[in-house]
Structure formats: C-alpha cells, structure tokens
C-alpha cells in the first residue's frame, strides 16, 4: 500500500542516505484456467494491486526524492514479454497487468526527460527463459479479503518444476534461467544506461515481430507461439 512504501522510502534514506537505484520487482501470477468472461474480480484486483499499483506506489514513494537530491539515479521496473510484446491467451490477467507496467514505464521515462531530470528509467524482462522463482506459487501470499473462488478449478502448475514436467509430457523441453543470471545481466545493462533490459530469446522475438507485422499490414492477429 502507498503508506508502507512511503515509510520504506523514509527508512531507506535515514539508514543509507539518498536512494539512487529503485527496483520495482514485486509480482504475482494468479492461477488462471478460465476465459476472461468467467474470471472473478478478486483475481484481477489482487494481480493489478501488486503488479501495477505496486509499481505505481514505488514510483510515487521514491522518485520525488531521487529527483530532489540531484545526484542522478535509475528506476528499474520488472515487466514481462507476456504483456509488453505479446499476449498469451492462457494468462489474461497477468498479461494485462504487465501491459500496464510497460506503458507506465515508457511514460515515466518520457516525463522524466521532459522534466530534464537526471533520474533515468529501465524496463527489465527477466529471462531469456522461464526464471526459477516462486511466481507460480504466488497464491501463498494472497490476502484473505481477495481470496480465490473456492469453486474455481485447481491449477496443475504451482512451481517451475510442474511447468517443466507438463511441457515435457507434451514433447517440449523448456529451458530455465536462474535468478542470479537475471540480476547479473540487469546490473550490466544498467551500467550501459540501457532502457531495454531484455536478454535475447529468438522464439519470443519472432512472436513479437509477427505481431508487429500484423499491425503494420493490418492482417489477422497471429497466435503467439513461443514454445
């Protein structure tokens, strides 16, 4: 919530001095098995409350002080190619939330430039493959007031291992990326002052190219096959 983020910003400054790097990285993925027209408001409110409003609260709590101290800095918002570049039909809530993060990040960059601030912005796409985190078990942190519908079907995937096993049963061998690799790549790109922190994944890039081509040519939207 905004109050806790404001308190965190004040604590960071009192403990460590001026903040120069802000990583808005919290994210959740609800267990999605239903089409949009059957989803429940609680699922949307929980995902957007963390994935979108969490980014917004971080920006509003930290960026004004980062601009004021005049020493420069950088905001890094964690996004996903699923939402920023393509939209997977199996995850309507998650992909919609990450599309919002992409837009917020671009606008923040442009507005800081218009303000002639030396606070810069980057957008991070963890990868290049599925990252071994606990994102698939995010339901463990879901607040009671936004509880999942007890009648909703159980999702078969609650860990990266579950996903790997399911894809393997379909004849698809997925690769994974360790969080430490993402962190190292991110820091290296920050040193280069890059906006796009996006490791190379040829299948994802081809899916994005196909989508852009359909926009330019006004042709039918392609199926974003990234596996």
Predicted stretch roles:
Residues 59-60:
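A short, exposed helix-loop element centered on a Lys and neighboring polar residues
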Residues 1-7, 41:
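The beta1-alpha1 cofactor-binding region of Rossmann-like NAD(H)/NADP(H)-dependent oxidoreductases
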Residues 11-22:
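A glycine-rich helix->loop->beta "capping" turn
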Residues 18-19, 66-80, 116-120:
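Active-site loop of short-chain dehydrogenase/reductase
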Residues 76-100, 105-106, 110-114, 127-130, ...:
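Catalytic loop of short-chain dehydrogenase/reductase
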Residues 111-197:
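SDR active-site lid
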Residues 33-36, 40-45:
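Substrate-binding pocket helix/loop in short-chain dehydrogenase/reductase
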């Amino acid at each position: 919530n905004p109050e806790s983020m404001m308190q965190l910003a004040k604590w960071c400054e009192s403990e460590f001095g001026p903040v120069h790097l802000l990583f808005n990285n919290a994210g959740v993925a609800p267990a999605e098995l239903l089409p949009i027209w059957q989803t429940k408001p609680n699922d949307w409110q929980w995902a957007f409350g963390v994935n979108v409003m969490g980014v917004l609260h971080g920006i509003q709590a930290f960026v004004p002080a980062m601009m004021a101290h005049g020493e420069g800095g950088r905001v890094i918002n964690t996004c996903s190619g699923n939402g920023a570049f393509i939209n997977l039909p199996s995850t309507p809530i998650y992909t919609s939330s990450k599309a919002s993060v992409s837009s917020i990040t671009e606008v923040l960059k442009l507005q800081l430039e218009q303000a002639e601030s030396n606070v810069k912005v980057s957008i991070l796409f963890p990868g290049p493959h599925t990252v071994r985190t606990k994102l698939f078990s995010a339901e463990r942190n879901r607040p009671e007031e936004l509880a999942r519908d007890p009648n909703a079907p159980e999702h078969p995937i609650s860990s990266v291992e579950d996903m790997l096993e399911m894809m393997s049963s379909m004849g698809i061998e997925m690769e994974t990326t360790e969080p430490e690799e993402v962190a190292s790549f991110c820091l290296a790109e920050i040193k280069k002052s890059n906006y796009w922190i996006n490791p190379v994944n040829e299948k994802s890039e081809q899916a994005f190219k196909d989508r852009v081509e359909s926009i330019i040519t006004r042709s039918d939207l392609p199926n974003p096959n990234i596996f």
